[in-house]
């Protein structure tokens, strides 16, 4: 884990603490801190899925957005973790979350994910090809709260 990943991890943990205190299952909520906007939703078992939209570009000028999955035992998995693949399945289509952005295929995959997550009422999260959670969300809430590609992209 690099220093940037570690600092993002610490930031995410501190933001997650505030999210979990008042999270209503199935409703997206937004938080902001130190240049990161995070959108989180919990399921009924207490798992939390978070979209991290950073406002801080890396040394090459790219925004390294990511997703996190916090499990019920508070272990956290990030799309930036080495050796970890995170895939979101919604509406019978899979979205492999890129571990880095700033390259055409990764940016295109992220764009498609951000476009479509706003339009789905249910999605599954897979970590290393194993189902890790199912999230059922309120569609009206998702449309109001979740970012558009312009708010969470690399364009």
Go through the PLM ranges and name each one.
Residues 18-20:
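N-terminal signal peptide c-region/cleavage motif recognized by signal peptidases
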Residues 22-155:
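A generic "folded-domain core" signal
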Residues 1-10:
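Bacterial N-terminal signal peptides that target proteins for export
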């Amino acid at each position: 884990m690099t220093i940037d990943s570690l600092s993002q991890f610490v930031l995410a943990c501190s933001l997650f603490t505030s999210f979990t205190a008042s999270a209503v299952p199935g409703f997206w909520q937004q938080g902001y801190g130190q240049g990161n906007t995070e959108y989180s939703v919990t399921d009924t078992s207490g798992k939390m899925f978070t979209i991290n939209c950073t406002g801080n570009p890396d040394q090459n000028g790219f925004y390294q957005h990511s997703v996190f999955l916090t499990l019920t035992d508070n272990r956290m998995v990030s799309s930036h973790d080495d050796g970890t693949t995170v895939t979101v399945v919604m509406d019978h289509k899979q979205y492999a979350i890129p571990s880095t952005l700033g390259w055409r295929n990764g940016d295109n995959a992220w764009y498609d994910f951000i476009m479509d997550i706003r339009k789905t009422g249910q999605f599954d999260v897979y970590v290393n090809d194993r189902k890790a959670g199912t999230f059922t969300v309120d569609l009206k809430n998702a449309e109001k709260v979740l970012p558009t590609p312009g708010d969470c992209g690399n364009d």
